[in-house]
């Protein structure tokens, strides 16, 4: 495994970085208590938006993390206002016909249930898990990402869903219904079998044939089909760590190690990847700070389950990544309307992909959230929202 000599964030530095992040959340409460943040910033400032994007759960997740860190009731009050909005969204089925129920409801409503016993949050999250079940394709044994369920052009799943299926594992725990767990297990088995290449890299999206056999991997937001989209690799790393948390199946740690090894092999010296890891840092291609924050969370989660030698290596890597983020990518606290991390990439167009260009070299809401989550993990024994 590739190692680095970079500075590793100390406990004191983690506490200060988290305090700065909480200050940034506090600064933004007047802007975004009654609305959501757009998926990405514009000139490093987030436009407000209605609760109708797949990314709307990350800002409330930041508020809950700030509440955990400070105990300040203003964060709890603001977070519960958001929970009510998410309960309304799932009740009215507003833009929920896709697979991103975990991204929406784990850091908002599951968090509310775990932290303050919110029945509204619990019930909304269970309803979101039920909605996610409607995306299941039994022939291919996967949760379809996008589009209508009878559209052959969308008969596929994506690596991001590794962070959506934990909602199903949680729902199985709180309801006692094994059906959620069975669907989660089926989808992750399909993902592990097809979405991770032999070298540990990942496909963004993977198409299946109508008879349930694999068809092939394609990109949407990576540079091209056979390149190495950084955020997809990060979802694979963290998702496999959480998969082990819920199942204690060693195959998840095996996949984690291989995906991590590939990720590390493609990092520049400051440990923050380009948006697609096909590119070297001297290429001038934009970085994606959010990928580093996601991987740091995965390292700290997986480190709970291995021997101390390996755990210490993984924790050091996470601390090095976070030190780099805090020193060179973090927003100065108190910057009204901005996020936590600069230099994220949502969706960069290439000659070979199908995405809409948005949020290039900007703050991205999930990067902000996972940066705070990783810092929180360094300051306490944190219970997953996922």
What annotation goes with each model-predicted range?
Residues 1-386:
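Glycan-recognition and catalytic cores of secretory/periplasmic carbohydrate-active enzymes
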């Amino acid at each position: 495994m590739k190692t680095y000599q970079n500075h590793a964030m100390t406990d004191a530095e983690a506490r200060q970085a988290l305090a700065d992040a909480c200050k940034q959340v506090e600064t933004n409460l007047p802007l975004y208590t009654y609305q959501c943040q757009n998926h990405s910033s514009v000139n490093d400032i987030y436009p407000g938006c209605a609760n109708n994007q797949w990314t709307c759960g990350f800002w409330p997740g930041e508020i809950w993390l700030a509440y955990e860190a400070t105990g300040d009731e203003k964060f709890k009050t603001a977070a519960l206002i958001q929970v009510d909005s998410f309960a309304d969204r799932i009740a009215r089925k507003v833009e929920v016909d896709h697979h991103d129920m975990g991204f929406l409801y784990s850091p908002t409503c599951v968090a509310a249930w775990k932290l303050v016993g919110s029945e509204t949050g619990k019930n909304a999250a269970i309803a979101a898990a039920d909605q996610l079940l409607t995306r299941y394709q039994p022939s291919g044994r996967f949760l379809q990402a996008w589009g209508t369920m009878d559209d052959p052009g969308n008969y596929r799943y994506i690596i991001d869903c590794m962070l959506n299926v934990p909602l199903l594992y949680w729902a199985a725990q709180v309801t006692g219904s094994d059906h959620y767990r069975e669907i989660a297990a089926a989808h992750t088995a399909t993902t592990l079998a097809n979405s991770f290449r032999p070298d540990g890299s990942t496909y963004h999206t993977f198409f299946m044939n109508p008879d349930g056999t694999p068809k092939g991997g394609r990109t949407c937001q990576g540079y091209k089909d056979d390149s190495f989209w950084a955020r997809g690799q990060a979802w694979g790393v963290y998702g496999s760590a959480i998969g082990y948390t819920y199942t204690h199946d060693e195959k998840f740690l095996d996949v984690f190690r291989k995906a991590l090894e590939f990720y590390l092999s493609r990092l520049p010296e400051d440990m923050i990847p380009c948006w697609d890891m096909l590119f070297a840092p001297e290429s001038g291609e934009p970085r994606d700070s959010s990928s580093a924050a996601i991987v740091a969370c995965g390292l700290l989660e997986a480190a709970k389950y291995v021997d101390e030698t390996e755990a210490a290596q993984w924790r050091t890597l996470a601390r090095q990544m976070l030190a780099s983020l805090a020193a060179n990518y973090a927003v100065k606290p108190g910057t009204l309307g901005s996020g936590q991390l600069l230099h994220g990439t949502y969706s960069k167009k290439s000659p070979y992909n199908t995405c809409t260009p948005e949020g290039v070299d900007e703050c991205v809401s999930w990067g902000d959230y996972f940066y705070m989550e990783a810092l929180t993990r360094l300051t306490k024994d944190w219970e997953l929202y996922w």
